[in-house]
């Protein structure tokens, strides 16, 4: 016998499963692809789960499922997940402190650019050959000072649309 190469996908079938598959091929059942998990629930809420099953469908709408069935204890999984969430989650007081700290840091960062922008606005800028109407239009559309509007118009060679777009970013 030759060795099975590494990384190959080999499925070993027992005698009964092999016979069942041969009968299915004779019955004309169609294989359904793309099913990752099948679960069956009994009356007492006991759940049987089959991961990566092979599912076949008959013409009448019945299904045949091949795979290893395992008893799925959903309540244990749920309890473990809740325990994990509780160990990771913070108390409301800790969350409030984190939010306050983040707000304080954001407030400090936003105050610095605003102060720098005010300093830029104080220095008068020469309008040159730009019309007062263009400056007013850019300033009002972009919600900026006239000095910023003049600078943007000069950067874009008097192009109103590009100046407004640059200031709106």
Curated annotation (Swiss-Prot):
It is found in: Cytoplasm; Nucleus. Pfam families: NAC, UBA_HYPK. It comes from the Eukaryota. PROSITE patterns: NAC_AB. Signal peptide: none annotated. Keywords: Cytoplasm, Nucleus, Protein transport, Transport. SUPFAM superfamilies: UBA-like. Residues 85-128 are annotated as: Disordered. Gene3D superfamilies: DNA helicase RuvA subunit, C-terminal domain, Nascent polypeptide-associated complex domain. Residues 130-169 form the UBA domain. GO terms for cellular component: nascent polypeptide-associated complex; nucleus. Residues 14-78 form the NAC-A/B domain. Part of the nascent polypeptide-associated complex (NAC), consisting of EGD2 and EGD1. NAC associates with ribosomes via EGD1. PANTHER family: NASCENT POLYPEPTIDE ASSOCIATED COMPLEX ALPHA SUBUNIT-RELATED. Belongs to the NAC-alpha family. Component of the nascent polypeptide-associated complex (NAC), a dynamic component of the ribosomal exit tunnel, protecting the emerging polypeptides from interaction with other cytoplasmic proteins to ensure appropriate nascent protein targeting. The NAC complex also promotes mitochondrial protein import by enhancing productive ribosome interactions with the outer mitochondrial membrane and blocks the inappropriate interaction of ribosomes translating non-secretory nascent polypeptides with translocation sites in the membrane of the endoplasmic reticulum. This is Nascent polypeptide-associated complex subunit alpha. It comes from Vanderwaltozyma polyspora (strain ATCC 22028 / DSM 70294 / BCRC 21397 / CBS 2163 / NBRC 10782 / NRRL Y-8283 / UCD 57-17).
